[in-house]
């Protein structure tokens, strides 16, 4: 089962960071030219994933410009009010060095929507539900910016998130292009190191930071799994039976998040 999942998610047990950088930058540049879009739009949180995706995109658009085409990276900060780790986000922006920086505070949109929802439902929605609203509003903003500039939205999904379904459906799971697809969390760190990222970016504790009640809750706490174990599972390395079962069950239970909407012709859900 482990091998089948890894193959489905395009995970390699070993990578050459420099080769992966070259391959993924070329992919971004080639697809941008093919699509005839004006560039890429990416939300920047301050974490490892958006920093890596952002830097790859910036190198790609510069490559496209070097051969005479217009191309821009719009990097967007999308805080909910005052972000606890705002300094990390600014460090990530400096590392990415995007062509254009934008900022949009989603707090008023989130709060107003939730007030109206609570009134309509007659009860207060959960903090988890509210967190998913934040993720989806962030994607609404990114697609609005992309539509304004005729650009493409970049997602940061990678293998460790994909296998666990650790993303918001139609939130951060929505995108036009996924340059980190197939990478484990540790492989992403290796690419950041090869790109010259500072230690604070590479070693930053991963957090979705969507919950009001538990700000900056580490991903590993929320998942109940360590990324090193998820990576080992994906790379075909030995892990305990309990970990194998936990990851496999999460993979199965979140399959709907990795599939298009179900139709009368869909059969995967019956298996």
UniProtKB/Swiss-Prot annotation:
One of its GO terms (cellular component) is cytoplasm. Keywords: ATP-binding, Ligase, Magnesium, Metal-binding, NAD, Nucleotide-binding. Deamido-NAD(+) binds at residues 136, 169, 176, 256-257. The keyword Nucleotide-binding applies. It holds the Pfam family NAD_synthase. InterPro entries: NAD/GMP_synthase, NAD_synthase, NH(3)-dep_NAD(+)_synth, Rossmann-like_a/b/a_fold. One of its GO terms (molecular function) is NAD+ synthase (glutamine-hydrolyzing) activity. Pathway: Cofactor biosynthesis; NAD(+) biosynthesis; NAD(+) from deamido-NAD(+) (ammonia route): step 1/1. Homodimer. Belongs to the NAD synthetase family. This is NH(3)-dependent NAD(+) synthetase.
């Amino acid at each position: 089962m482990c091998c089948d999942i890894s193959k489905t998610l395009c995970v390699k047990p070993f990578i050459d960071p420099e080769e992966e950088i070259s391959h993924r930058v070329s992919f971004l540049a080639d697809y941008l030219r093919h699509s005839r879009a004006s560039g890429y739009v990416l939300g920047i949180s301050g974490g490892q994933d958006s920093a890596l995706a952002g830097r790859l995109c910036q190198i790609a658009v510069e490559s496209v410009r070097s051969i005479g085409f217009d191309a821009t990276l719009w990097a967007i900060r999308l805080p909910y009010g005052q972000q606890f780790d705002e300094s990390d986000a600014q460090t990530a922006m400096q590392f990415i060095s995007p062509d254009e920086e934008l900022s949009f505070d989603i707090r008023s949109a989130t709060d107003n929507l939730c007030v109206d929802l609570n009134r309509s439902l007659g009860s207060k929605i959960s903090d988890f539900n509210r967190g998913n609203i934040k993720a989806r509003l962030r994607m609404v903003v990114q697609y609005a910016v992309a539509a304004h500039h005729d650009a493409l939205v970049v997602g940061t999904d990678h293998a460790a998130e994909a296998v666990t379904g650790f993303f918001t459906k139609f939130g951060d799971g929505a995108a036009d292009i996924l340059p980190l697809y197939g990478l484990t969390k540790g492989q992403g760190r290796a690419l950041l190191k090869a790109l010259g990222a500072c230690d604070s970016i590479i070693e930053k504790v991963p957090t979705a930071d969507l919950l009001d009640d538990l700000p900056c809750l580490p991903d590993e706490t929320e998942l109940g799994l360590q990324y090193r174990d998820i990576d080992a599972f994906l790379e075909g390395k030995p892990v305990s039976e309990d970990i194998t079962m936990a990851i496999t069950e999460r993979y199965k239970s979140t399959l709907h998040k990795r599939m298009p909407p179900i139709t009368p012709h869909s059969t995967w859900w019956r298996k």
